[in-house]
Amino acid sequence: MQRLAIILAMCGATTLALWPVENTSPSYIWNASESVPIGLYRLRDVGRLDVTELVAVRPPEPLATFLALNGYLPNGLPMLKRVLALPGQTVCRTGPTIVVDSIEMGQARDRDQRGRPLPVWQGCRILGADEIFVMNWQSADSFDGRYFGPIPASSVIGRAIPVWTDRE
């Protein structure tokens, strides 16, 4: 346990030391959520996004406030999510089922791990030029597009490249 505390302290100190003061987006972030491997990630320029890419997203309002008020993510912190759909693709939620371009991609849950009801959106939409859909399909407990739907592409602050994770 002491070894883990030392590693976490070193990662935190490294992150602060490498964080450019003039930049509002971090160069490195620590992910503590289990929806992707826990660990240190370096952020790279976005450029053109691809489906399945792991990105850091700054939640837009009112999502950011919802996440903070309900204890999912402190205000101002980015979340790591996989890009599941890009502009021009069709994303649907019918009941709990998430479908992208007629392919079932996963299920939403009714309640979170604490038993609280989760947000629900329904219907189909073709993503606009400025929208993406993010979902960590490998994690059934991830709070992602299953619950909040598409988000602005401008919410992406960088590609997340693993530096060190608990799965290495």
Predicted features, each with a name:
Residues 40, 54, 90, 131-132:
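Residue-level marker of beta-strand positions
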Residues 108-113, 117-160, 164:
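Acidic/glycine-rich C-terminal interaction modules and beta/coil loop segments
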Residues 35, 77-79, 85, 118-121:
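Residues that act as N-cap/strand-start positions at coil-to-secondary-structure junctions
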Residues 75-107:
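Mid-length scaffold segments of soluble, non-membrane domains
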Residues 46, 60, 96, 103, ...:
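Surface loops and adjacent helix of pleckstrin homology
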Residues 1-78, 126, 148-168:
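Protein maturation boundaries and topogenic segments
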